Design a protein with these regions (language model features):
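Active-site anion/phosphate-binding pocket segments in diverse small-molecule metabolic enzymes
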Residues: 2-27, 31, 81, 101, ...
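Active-site-proximal beta-alpha core segment in soluble small-molecule metabolic enzymes
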Residues: 21-24, 31-32, 39-198, 202-204, ...
Length: 387
């Protein structure tokens, strides 16, 4: 299958005339993050997690940039995401489906597009066998998260052998890696190590996600699966490793006006001006994915200034207190990016950066900013069959 070419400047020209709420995708920062994680992974291979449209950043530009940097193994959620990713990356990349199979019909998609699904139940093996699946699968085991994972993996391994289904590796997932001192980390890591040694020592093993790679590097095994760290959010905020935000979410100033002391702002009159003030109407709202809970507590950044969000965020707009600022109509303010990290914004809402990034919807165009020319790379190893 011929990979579709990625031309970031063409994409920019197509979207520049749209509504002035934009997410710039800084691909140089993506490469910085990838190389930072590559160094930490040492001997382990990188399986780049690009599910949910690359955490809201745009699957095509993110995956192709990583592939050009030497990454050969990617993970998405399901067969539909996998088929789309295959069209972007061509036939050489390995593509793993972390959520596995939801129905038997997906086996045909996996076969056609050379996708490597995760299996967790006997029915998955039956589906694969019935469709004469000739690819590989990953076995996912539950070591304590109580989410997706086989409870009796030794039985599934035996069944795979009986049905002549090739295993690419064995994996599990950490529940508390972003809390390094949590005792469940050791419980899961020890359980996974022992399980791997007991039932599949010959298979590649994968346990660590982004936070795990930072907190538990001794458990790298053969393959690590960074996700959020690729996009520049620090997985463990109090242990930063110098990641750079890839997405810069911005909105353009549509109007500036003076309001008098005692005036109320926006829906519900939830903000009352304590003094005469100047406000700016910005083209970004909850209809774009800006969390409405930032109303009256969040802020935007402009030339190093923090401009408070005042009044309730509307579907299409929000209001900023710009008193004393040099801000003008048509200027652009940033809601998160390098100057205002997604970790900082998430902490205001007692949430995680994942929800911010994946919450920005398709009404906001992603404008890729091309990286600087890169030196020749040594390709990272692939995991699982790619056909």
């Amino acid at each position: 299958m011929q990979a579709q070419s990625f031309d970031p400047m063409r994409k920019a020209s197509e979207t520049i005339a749209m509504r002035p709420a934009i997410a710039h995708i800084h691909l140089q920062n993506l490469l910085h993050n990838y190389q930072t994680l590559r160094q930490r992974a040492e001997h382990a291979q990188i399986m780049a997690v690009v599910k949910a449209d690359a955490y809201g950043h745009g699957l095509k530009c993110i995956s192709q940039t990583l592939q050009q940097a030497g990454c050969e193994c990617f993970a998405v959620t399901d067969a539909s995401e996998g088929a789309l990713l295959r069209s972007y990356l061509g036939k050489k990349a390995s593509i793993v489906l972390l959520s596995g199979l939801f129905e038997s019909a997906e086996v045909s998609t996996c076969q056609t597009h050379h996708l490597t699904p995760v299996i967790t139940e006997e029915k998955h093996i039956q589906w694969l066998s019935e469709k004469s699946f000739t690819g590989q699968v990953w076995l996912k085991v539950d070591t304590g998260m109580q989410r997706l994972g086989a409870k009796h993996p030794e039985q599934l391994i035996q069944s795979c052998h009986q049905h002549q289904i090739a295993l690419a590796g064995i994996m599990s997932h950490l529940a508390c890696a972003d809390t390094p001192a949590h005792p469940l980390n050791t419980v899961q890591a020890d359980a996974f190590y022992q399980l791997h040694q007991d039932i599949a020592p010959h298979l590649p093993a994968s346990l660590l996600n982004s936070a795990g790679l930072i907190a538990l590097p001794q458990h790298k095994h053969d393959i690590v699966r960074p996700g959020i760290a690729l996009y520049g959010a620090e997985p463990i905020p109090h242990e930063p490793i110098g990641l750079k935000p890839v997405m810069q979410l911005s909105g353009q100033v549509m109007q500036i006006r003076d309001v008098l002391k005692g005036s109320t702002l926006s829906y519900g009159a939830s903000f009352t001006a304590k003094d005469d003030m100047t406000i700016a109407l910005v083209c970004l709202g909850y209809g774009d994915g800006l969390p409405r809970t930032l109303s009256n507590q969040g802020y935007a950044e402009f030339q190093g200034q923090h401009l408070p969000i005042v009044g309730r965020i509307c579907m299409d707009f929000c209001l900023l207190d710009v008193s004393g600022s040099d801000l003008e109509v048509n200027d652009t303010v940033t809601f998160w990016g390098e100057s205002l990290s997604p970790n900082t914004v998430a902490s205001l809402l007692d949430t995680i950066p994942y929800t911010l990034m994946t919450g920005i919807n398709q009404r906001v165009p992603r404008i890729p900013i091309p990286p600087k020319p890169q030196p020749p790379f040594v390709a990272d190893g692939a995991a699982g069959a790619s056909g």
